[in-house]
Amino acid sequence: MCLAIPCKVVEIIEEDGEKYAIAEYKGVKQKAKLTLLDKEVKIGDYILIHTGYALEVLSEEDAKLSLEAWEELFKALEEMEQ
């Protein structure tokens, strides 16, 4: 099972003939290989990343719903620690 947070694509790069997305979540950027996707990824898209590969492109609506759920979880965990 994979738990992935939607990341917003801020850059598309090409290295050694392979396309990668640079995606960001809360200021943290990571590089994801795009070879597993059958859909073209654009700057501004939201993707799910696992082990360095983009697994899925999400609609903005789905990404925002998921991000809201993650924020609720983080807030609940923070409250439990206090």
Curated annotation (Swiss-Prot):
GO molecular function: carbon dioxide binding; iron ion binding
SUPFAM superfamilies found in the cross-reference section: HupF/HypC-like (SSF159127)
InterPro entries named in the record: Hydgase_assmbl_chp_CS, Hydrogenase_HupF/HypC
Signal peptide: none
Domain of life: Archaea
GO biological process, one term: protein maturation
Family: Belongs to the HupF/HypC family.
The name this protein goes by in its record: Uncharacterized hydrogenase expression/formation protein MJ0200
Species of provenance: Methanocaldococcus jannaschii (strain ATCC 43067 / DSM 2661 / JAL-1 / JCM 10045 / NBRC 100440) (Methanococcus jannaschii)
